[in-house]
Amino acid sequence: MGTRGLQGLGGRPQGRGCLLLAVAGATSLVTLLLAVPITVLAVLALVPQDQGRRVEKIIGSGAQAQKRLDDSKPSCILPSPSSLSETPDPRLHPQRSNASRNLASTSQGPVAQSSREASAWMTILSPAADSTPDPGVQQLPKGEPETDLNPELPAAHLIGAWMSGQGLSWEASQEEAFLRSGAQFSPTHGLALPQDGVYYLYCHVGYRGRTPPAGRSRARSLTLRSALYRAGGAYGRGSPELLLEGAETVTPVVDPIGYGSLWYTSVGFGGLAQLRSGERVYVNISHPDMVDYRRGKTFFGAVMVG
């Protein structure tokens, strides 16, 4: 007869029950071991996605806040030179101050500080220069433009010329010489001016000579004179009067080589004189044989100035 299996209380066999318990325990253990990693993986898979959404939401809200701050920030635009020259409107300054205070109250941190600095900088540049003249500063009167002399005023310009048998003479129509507005010239009587008035008289006479050759006595000094006289009118024919005079002293140097070389000098002067109609002006020269007759060297004239 075969051997019977173990039996427990009540006569039930114990081998099958133990096997079932062992299988159930192993199944529970395996299920527990698999559930833990799956749960961890599920948590790790869900948590980063959720956190990523939160980061995007935070970044989006920060960008919107920065945009609102940029929109509310005042634009720092340099004023043009024309705006600086205009008179500022006092009603605009309280609005600018209120806007600065509102911006400072709504903004915090470095952005608010930079906004306050920009507002203060704009406030410093805002006052414009007053273009109205200061009553305490004396304004200089504008001078009247200068005008040329009236072309109708009498004037004359005569140039020296050599005349055979007479020596020094004066030309009234050659080169730069002219007579204007009734002025007349006669070689024997001189220059006649038609109107009473103040005249500017001038005279320039060029002189030239030759130094003595070597072996002769030392040359003496020469005093060259030129003068303007007036005659006629209230002074009578025989009573000339000296108006202006110039003089120059020359001491020629002996030429040690041979024949003496040429030397040059000039005597020039000018001034104002009160002349009357009918009076005549003429030139008196001390050394007519030494006069330089080249162009631009010898001349005299008169022009009415008042």
From Swiss-Prot:
Protein's membrane topology: Single-pass type II membrane protein
Alphabetized Pfam families for the sequence: TNF
Keywords for the protein's UniProt record, in alphabetical order: Cytokine, Glycoprotein, Membrane, Signal-anchor, Transmembrane, Transmembrane helix
Biased composition (Low complexity): 74-85
TM spans (from-to): 28-48
InterPro entries in the record: TNF, TNF_C, TNF_CS, TNF_dom, Tumour_necrosis_fac-like_dom
Family annotation (PANTHER family): LYMPHOTOXIN-BETA, TUMOR NECROSIS FACTOR FAMILY MEMBER
The protein's name: Lymphotoxin-beta
Gene name in the database record: Ltb
Glycosylated residues in this chain: N98, N284
